[in-house]
Structure formats: structure tokens, C-alpha cells
């Protein structure tokens, strides 16, 4: 290991940021255990690991959000501490988050110089402001109108503004947290061109992505994390299968325990569903006992389709039929009454009432349906909540505990439990295991198995292709708001899915549609 | 979290009491204040004075119970003072100028409150106006209508309304009304689907909506309820004076908000209790009463009350931090 590491870095400059055997625990949970990372100028270090592997904790330690419990941080070879983000910034460490830290109503120039606005007699010196902002943008060679409102720019342009802002603060180390997640193919190319330029200028970069091909394209080395442990540091062009094996650490069969029950009658039928700017001509069928995966890139319209089936958003035309009954559409409570349960993509913002108890969260969908004369069935709701919490093995101190105390996996099990209580037999899952650790993932897959064994139907949106390949019986791939094709789960590879997923993205018409989808998302 | 449970079980009686005091800061403050006032002046703890405090706190408490519904849903209602005046004035108008029977005019007053609240609720839920703006508008409109109806002068109110301000068999009706309003508020919040839905909406509106709760309808009902409570408070005020005053209840919305917040609710929504609100309202009345007895000028009273609001909320912030 030591020898290979020396070989890996023999021509590399000395690291400017080092994490030396750092550890971090939250309560009894050891999130990061003795991980060492070297960040070198002019190099791109890719961090690879599953959700919950500890990547985000690690970058939060680099940017001063978290302090390590053990080990030390070295900047320019000198041991130091990063007690807050200000200190990290003063060392030239900047993070570009997925959610950008920009003020949408201010101009590009003002955003680049935010917090350091040049003044003259206490007034904004607009001449200097524009000159300095332009200099920052020139560093990355991107042509953006300085006077444009940031909110009017596309997400890719906004990212460039954010990078320029970081560089203008003399950032030497850029941490890019999944920067490509919201970008189209062409925008990714542009971002990578900027990354290459910054490499030449000697900027050190830490790059996080779930896409192995991107890591191979842009990374120099890749560090693999698993369950908070450092596994290996390898050249970025290492064989993908090898990287996956290191990242997952076990065979796929164990990780996705899909049991295939007997397939019955169609439970959910969607016919020619259209919603302008969101998706076009969606038809699909999910039968009793079946898990259908809905794959595709971010912005392909998967979430929008699921929301429309669940009655959250209205559609322009088309039919949703549940167990032979046609729904009026655009009515959440109608969908629930007919057996639809919707697990939204953002658990904290859309799934849970974080300040309320586990019990109240479990009983949210059945609050009205179990009531008598407008009065809550308190003992019944409590009894049923206790039963379902036991059945789904939700780990908690008590049903009265605030749900915010629970781990991500147990929170998600509670959202499942809500629909178990409601007797839903058509489950719409949107990224059901996002932010859930590996162990709890398997438990959630077992819940999915139980639902289908009882004759339920599951439509599952997931950006994690291994999950789709491992848990779905059939896979529908969306691209540019349409269903681009259907694949059987058996014998399909990630590449097959990706080929369909990008099939409509590269022509400019759908790219516009994708941008529109982004916009409608923001409007909500 | 499991360790917290263990330590709670192990904890001594003393730390249990400490824990309870931390969680019931407003009540502890109220008791401490009462003890202090009793030591300062024996006149404080006499039956007539206590009844006096009860009557003085009744109006604000009734308004504050209605405000509790609104604040639990993460909203705000700035119109309750004006709606109180409007409900009372309409009632008096229909009695004195139209000549309808007294008990009907009482119902009219409550209905006007419901209507005003529902209009606020509709413009918030369906018109997508921020609650602050919608109820600020209603505050101005309701006050304006009150002045138009009354031409700026008091109007005598119906005997049925005046009964709300009297004392029967030694029981002052304002206190009875306050108790009734409080029990209904507690019942709605803790036992009914409507009440539990309010907590869900205030805690996370999107999660509530995706779980099938009729969020918009509930919001309209919440503001309508606050309107009814406001009108009831206005009628009680009117009953005590036997006439509806055009300037009644000016600034009361702020007292009501203060009572709810002192009672432990967060303006961010999802929390709040009828018992807390009652304690908040009584605390405000005790402070005013105590300072009056001690001959402190009413100018100073405002300063003290401002400090108490800041203290109560600051205390809550600390409590939430330590519990994390």
C-alpha cells in the first residue's frame, strides 16, 4: 500500500491540504474512521463512495463546518485547525455546493463580490465592482454578462459565477460537491474545460461524483471510502468494476435482496399522460407484485411523472387508472383513497414534519380517515403506529420522540409506515434510499419486497443505477420528458440504461425542455 | 437519544423538577411573580384583586386562544383587534339602529368575525398572499368599516351582549367566557383532526399536503376560527361597557401575539398550546395589575412588558439549544 502510494504520487507536487487519520463521530455513530486524504495543487482528487460512506462529512471537515474528533488537518504541511468556515476560507479553501450560495435577485458582478463590495465614501463603487468581477470571470474564461441577474441564468452559468466568486477570494483549493448532478452533457463538458484550466493554474480540486466515467475523465486520483473507512487511493482511470467492488465491498446480490413474487393484474395504469414543459406521452403499467424502476438523468421528468400520478401536480391530458378505476387527477386525497402512497424525493422538506413525533408522522395520512365526528382516534392511531413501527423495525426511543432525532434510514421507514397504515397498495417511490446508510437500505428493500409479496405494485424512481438494476423487475428509462425505452432487469447493464437516458438529451430541443423543467421546479 | 432516556430514568427528583421548570418557564415565571407581588403588597392576593386580574386578562386571552390556532400553522393574524371591534360594532348597530333581538345581534357579531377571518384565510390560502399582508389589510379594512358604521361614536349594545360583561352568582362572565374559549381551544388543538392537522401544516406544509391533508381548507378554517374568537373578545369588551366603542381593541393583536409567544409557541409554526397561551395572557395581566398596585406609571409598564416578551422568547431559545 505504502509503496504503491509512493508510486502514485512520485511526480506530484507536495500536498497543500492534508487530512491525517481524521475521525468523526455523531453520538455513538462513527461516521469517519481514521481517514487520510492529500490534496495537491494542480490535481483533481475524486472522492468515491456510496451515500453514507462519509464523503460529505469529510468535505465538511475540510471546509471548517465540522471539526475532527481525532487526527489532524495540515495546511501547507503545518498542523492547524479549521474551527469555522471563515478560517477555512482564509486558507483558500472554498466549497461549491450543489445548492449554490448566490443571491438570485442581484447581478453577476454583485454576487461575485458579495461581502467584499468595493466602496467609495461608504457607497458602492460600481466601477471597481465590475472591474474586479470581470477579472474573476476572466480567470475561468467564461463569458457572462456582468449586469445580468443571477436568477435569470441557467444553473450551469450560476455555477460558473460561484466558482469565479471563490477564485476571486484567492481560493487555492476548490471542493466541488456533485457539480454535475444538475447539468446536461454539454454543460458538463464546459465545466470540465474550466476544471482543466484551473488545474493548469495550480488550483487543487476535490471532486465528488457518482458517475465513474466523469471521474475517469477529470480526476487524477480517486480515493474510495466505504462506511467511513478509507479503502484505497488509485489512479482515476482504474477499471470501473474494480472501483465499484471497492466502493460497495460486497457482491450486488446481497445488497439488493429482491425476491420476485408472482406477477398479477395491472394495479397502476398510466395512459398518454402529458404536461407541457414537464413530460410528454407517458404510458406505463405496474402490475401487482411488480417493482418497476423509472431511471433517467436529473431533469428527465421522472419526479414530475410520479408527482402527477400521485395527484400533486395537474396534467394537461391522459389517464391514471388504479385497480381499474380512473382518477380525476390533480387531487392528492383522491389518489390516497384509491391506494396510492407517495414517498417524495426530499424526505425532510416534503416527507416529514420534523418537529413532530414519530407517532404523529406515521399517522399523518390516516388522521382524517380513522377519525370519528372530526375527533382523532387517539388510542387507535397510537396502537397502529406502535404495530407498524415494530413491523418495520423503526429504531427509536419512543413513539413520542421527535422524528428529527432518528437516523435517515429510520425516518424513511416512518414515511413508508405512513402508507402501510393507510393501506396503500400502489407505492410511488422517489429516490427511496437517498441519504440512507447501507444497512438501512437493505431494510427498506425488504419493506419493498414485503409490499409486493402482498400484491402491491411499486414504481420506483432512483438515480442510483445499481439500485434500479438490483431491485426493479423492469426498468423504464426516461429521457427529455419521454419514456425512451424499457429494459428487463436481468442482463441489463448500467451502460444500457445510460445509453437510453442520454438518447434525447443531446439534441438542443430537449435541452431547452430540460431547462424549462428546472425553471418550473424553481417556481415551486 | 437512548442515553438521554437512561439518564432521565436515573435522574433525581431535584433534576426532574429542574427539567420541569425549564419546560414550563412561563408558568414558573408567573408563580414567581405572584409570590413576589404578594410579598411586596398583601393587597395582591385578595379575592377581589384576583377576580380583577381574571377579568382584565379575559379579552386578551380570548384573542390569544384564536391567535394560537393561527400561530400553530406558522401564520400570523394582525387583524384580531380590529375584527373584535367590528364584530361588536356590527352587533350593536343591528340592535340599536335596526332593532333586531339581542341574542340575534350577538350571533351576528360572531358571524361577522367568522366572515372577516374567512376572507383573510381565503386570501392567504387561495390568493397566496402572505398572512402578514392579508391580515394587515384586514386590520385596516375592519377598523375602517367599524368607523363607518359607528360614525366614530359609541353605540349601545344589546342586553344579551351586556350579559357577557356582568357577574352572575359571583361568577364574572368574562372569566367564564375565557374558560370556555380556552377549553374549546384546547379541545380543538389536541383532540380534533382539524387541530392535529394545524400542527402538521405549521411543522411542514408540503409534507402535510403530500399526505393528503386539505391544507387550503384548513387554513381558511383557522383564520375563520381566529375571527370568531376575536368577535367573542370584542363582545365581552362591549358587555363590560354596555356599548360598542369604535376604537376598541386597538393594538390588542400585539398583546395576543405576545401571550401566545410567552406561552411557548414558536412563530415558525408547529408548536403552541392552549394552556401556554392562557399562562401568557394571565402573566401579562398580572404584570399590569402588579405594577398598578405598586403605583408604577403605565409608561413604565410597557417597558416591563417588552422586556418580559424578550426574556420569555430568549429563554425558549436557550431551552431548545440545551435540549439539542
UniProtKB/Swiss-Prot annotation, chain A:
EC number: 7.5.2.7
CDD domains: ABC_Carb_Monos_I, ABC_Carb_Monos_II
InterPro entries: AAA+_ATPase (IPR003593), ABC_carbohydrate_import_ATPase (IPR050107), ABC_transporter-like_ATP-bd (IPR003439), ABC_transporter-like_CS (IPR017871), P-loop_NTPase (IPR027417)
MF-aspect GO terms: ABC-type D-ribose transporter activity; ATP binding; ATP hydrolysis activity
Protein family (similarity comment): Belongs to the ABC transporter superfamily. Ribose importer (TC 3.A.1.2.1) family.
Main location: membrane
Domain ABC transporter stretches: 17-252, 263-505
CC terms in the record's Gene Ontology section: plasma membrane
Listed name of the protein: Ribose import ATP-binding protein RbsA
PROSITE patterns with a match to the protein in the record: ABC_TRANSPORTER_1 (PS00211), ABC_TRANSPORTER_2 (PS50893), RBSA (PS51254)
Record: residues binding ATP: 49-56
Amino acid at each position: 500500500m505504502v509503496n504503491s502510494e509512493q508510486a502514485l504520487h512520485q511526480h506530484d507536487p507536495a500536498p497543500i491540504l492534508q487530512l491525517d487519520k481524521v475521525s468523526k463521530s455523531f453520538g455513538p455513530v462513527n461516521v469517519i474512521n481514521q481517514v487520510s486524504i492529500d490534496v495537491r495543487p494542480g490535481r483533481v482528487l475524486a472522492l468515491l463512495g456510496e451515500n453514507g460512506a462519509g464523503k460529505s462529512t469529510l468535505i465538511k471537515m475540510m471546509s471548517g463546518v465540522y471539526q475532527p474528533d481525532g487526527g489532524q488537518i495540515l495546511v501547507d504541511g503545518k498542523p492547524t485547525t479549521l474551527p469555522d468556515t471563515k478560517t477555512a476560507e482564509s486558507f483558500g479553501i472554498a466549497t461549491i455546493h450543489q445548492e449554490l450560495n448566490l443571491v438570485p435577485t442581484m447581478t453577476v458582478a454583485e454576487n461575485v463580490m458579495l461581502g467584499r463590495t468595493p466602496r467609495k465614501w461608504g457607497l458602492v463603487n460600481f466601477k471597481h465592482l465590475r472591474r474586479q468581477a470581470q477579472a474573476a470571470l476572466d480567470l475561468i474564461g467564461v463569458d457572462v454578462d456582468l449586469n445580468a441577474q443571477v436568477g435569470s441564468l441557467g444553473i450551469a452559468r450560476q455555477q460558473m459565477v460561484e466558482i469565479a466568486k471563490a477564485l476571486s477570494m484567492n481560493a487555492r483549493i476548490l471542493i466541488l460537491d456533485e457539480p454535475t448532478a444538475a447539468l446536461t452533457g454539454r454543460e458538463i463538458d464546459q465545466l470540465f474545460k474550466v476544471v482543466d484550466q484551473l488545474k493548469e493554474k495550480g488550483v487543487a480540486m476535490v471532486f465528488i461524483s457518482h458517475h465513474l466515467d466523469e471521474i475517469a475523465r477529470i480526476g487524477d486520483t480517486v480515493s474510495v471510502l466505504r462506511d467511513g473507512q478509507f479503502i484505497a487511493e488509485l489512479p482515476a482511470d482504474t477499471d470501473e468494476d474494480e472501483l465499484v467492488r471497492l466502493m460497495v465491498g460486497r457482491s450486488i446480490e446481497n445488497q439488493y435482496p429482491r425476491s420476485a413474487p408472482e406477477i398479477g393484474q395491472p394495479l397502476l395504469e398510466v395512459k398518454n399522460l402529458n404536461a407541457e414543459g414537464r413530460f410528454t406521452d407517458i404510458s406505463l403499467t405496474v402490475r401487482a407484485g411488480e417493482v418497476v424502476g423509472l431511471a433517467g438523468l436529473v431533469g428527465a421528468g421522472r419526479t414530475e411523472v410520479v408527482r402527477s400520478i400521485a395527484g400533486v401536480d395537474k396534467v394537461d391530458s391522459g389517464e391514471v387508472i388504479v385497480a381499474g378505476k380512473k382518477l380525476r387527477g390533480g387531487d392528492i386525497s383522491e389518489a390516497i383513497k384509491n391506494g396510492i402512497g407517495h414517498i417524495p424525493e426530499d424526505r425532510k422538506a416534503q416527507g416529514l414534519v420534523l418537529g413532530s413525533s414519530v407517532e404523529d408522522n406515521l399517522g399523518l395520512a390516516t388522521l382524517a380517515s380513522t377519525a370519528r365526528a372530526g375527533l382523532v382516534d387517539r388510542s387507535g392511531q397510537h396502537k397502529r403506529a406502535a404495530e407498524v413501527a415494530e413491523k418495520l423495525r423503526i429504531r427509536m426511543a419512543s413513539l413520542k420522540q421527535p422524528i428529527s432525532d432518528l437516523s435517515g434510514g429510520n425516518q424513511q421507514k416512518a414515511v413508508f409506515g405512513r402508507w402501510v397504515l393507510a393501506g396503500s397498495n400502489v407505492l410511488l417511490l422517489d429516490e427511496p434510499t437517498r441519504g440512507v446508510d447501507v444497512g438501512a437500505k437493505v431494510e427498506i428493500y425488504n419493506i419493498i419486497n414485503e409490499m409486493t409479496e402482498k400484491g402491491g405494485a411499486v414504481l420506483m424512481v432512483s438515480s442510483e443505477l445499481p439500485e434500479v438494476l438490483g431491485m426493479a423487475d423492469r426498468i423504464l428509462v426516461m429521457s427529455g420528458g419521454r419514456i425512451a425505452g424499457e429494459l428487463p432487469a436481468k442482463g441489463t447493464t448500467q451502460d444500457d440504461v445510460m445509453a437510453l437516458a442520454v438518447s434525447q438529451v443531446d439534441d438542443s430541443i430537449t435541452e431547452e425542455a430540460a431547462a424549462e423543467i428546472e425553471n418550473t421546479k424553481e417556481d415551486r | 437519544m437512548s442515553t438521554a432516556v437512561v439518564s432521565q430514568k436515573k435522574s433525581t427528583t431535584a433534576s426532574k423538577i429542574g427539567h420541569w421548570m425549564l419546560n414550563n418557564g412561563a408558568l414558573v415565571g408567573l408563580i414567581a411573580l405572584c409570590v413576589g407581588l404578594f410579598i411586596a403588597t398583601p393587597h395582591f392576593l385578595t379575592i377581589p384583586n384576583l377576580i380583577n386580574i381574571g377579568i382584565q386578562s379575559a379579552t386578551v386571552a380570548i384573542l390569544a386562544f384564536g391567535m394560537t390556532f393561527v400561530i400553530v400553522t406558522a401564520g400570523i393574524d394582525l387583524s384580531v383587534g380590529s375584527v373584535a371591534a367590528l364584530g361588536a360594532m356590527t352587533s350593536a348597530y343591528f340592535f340599536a339602529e335596526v332593532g333586531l333581538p339581542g341574542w340575534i345581534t350577538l350571533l351576528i357579531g360572531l358571524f361577522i368575525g367568522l366572515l372577516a377571518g374567512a376572507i383573510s384565510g381565503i386570501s392567504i390560502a387561495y390568493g397566496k398572499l402572505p398572512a402578514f399582508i392579508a391580515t394587515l389589510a384586514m386590520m385596516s379594512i375592519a377598523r375602517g368599516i367599524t368607523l363607518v358604521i359607528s360614525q366614530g361614536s359609541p353605540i349601545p349594545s344589546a342586553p344579551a351582549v351586556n350579559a357577557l360583561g356582568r357577574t352572575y352568582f359571583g361568577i364574572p362572565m368574562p372569566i367564564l367566557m375565557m374558560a370556555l374559549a380556552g377549553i374549546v381551544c384546547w379541545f380543538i388543538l389536541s383532540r380534533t383532526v382539524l387541530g392535529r392537522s394545524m400542527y402538521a401544516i405549521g411543522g411542514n406544509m408540503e409534507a402535510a399536503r403530500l399526505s393528503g391533508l386539505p391544507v387550503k381548507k384548513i387554513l381558511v378554517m383557522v383564520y375563520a376560527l381566529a375571527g370568531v374568537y376575536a368577535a367573542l373578545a370584542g363582545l365581552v369588551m362591549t358587555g363590560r361597557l354596555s356599548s360598542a366603542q369604535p376604537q376598541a381593541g386597538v393594538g390588542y393583536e400585539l398583546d395576543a401575539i405576545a401571550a401566545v409567544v410567552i406561552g411557548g409557541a414558536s412563530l415558525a409554526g408547529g408548536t403552541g398550546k392552549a394552556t401556554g397561551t392562557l399562562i401568557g395572557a394571565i402573566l401579562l395581566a398580572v404584570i399590569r395589575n402588579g405594577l398598578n398596585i405598586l403605583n408604577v406609571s403605565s409608561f413604565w409598564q410597557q417597558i416591563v412588558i417588552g422586556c418580559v416578551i424578550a426574556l420569555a422568547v430568549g429563554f425558549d431559545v436557550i431551552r431548545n439549544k440545551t435540549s439539542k
